[in-house]
């Protein structure tokens, strides 16, 4: 199976979840850096609690229907002050985690996935606050 097919299969598997979870969040267009930081903390900690390897924040999927609607969010174009979003986020998360953004061209629209490793020995905090999700709520 080619990488693009694996990526689409991963997205379709995530979309098959009946509801968002402590380790999975869908967004259409909200790309607020503060929101992304809070979700990184919450999804990392939620993945740890649920004994998953990682959490996911997916842009371009409707959070109520789980339909692919696409997104125009381009993480590489976002800045916080003079810093690129990824650098700003890396500095705001403690302990440091190896998150990564991925763009996926799904047949129904362009998606961006933020892969967030599960917290390990200590909860992940954003700006010194550790967040946690209870089901779909942060």
Where are these regions (language model features)?
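Conserved N-terminal catalytic/coupling substructures associated with nucleotide/phosphate chemistry
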Residues: 1-138
């Amino acid at each position: 199976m080619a990488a693009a097919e694996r990526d689409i299969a991963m997205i379709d598997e995530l979309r098959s979840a009946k509801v968002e979870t402590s380790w999975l969040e869908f967004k259409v267009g909200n790309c607020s850096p503060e929101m992304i930081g809070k979700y990184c903390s919450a999804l990392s900690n939620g993945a740890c609690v649920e004994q998953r390897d990682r959490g996911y924040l997916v842009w371009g999927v409707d959070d109520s229907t789980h339909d692919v609607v696409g997104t125009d969010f381009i993480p590489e174009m976002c800045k916080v002050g003079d810093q690129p979003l990824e650098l700003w986020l890396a500095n705001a998360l403690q302990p440091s985690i190896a998150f990564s953004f991925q763009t996926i061209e799904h047949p129904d629209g362009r998606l961006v996935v933020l892969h967030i490793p599960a917290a390990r020995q200590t909860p992940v905090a954003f700006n010194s606050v550790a967040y946690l999700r209870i089901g779909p709520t942060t």
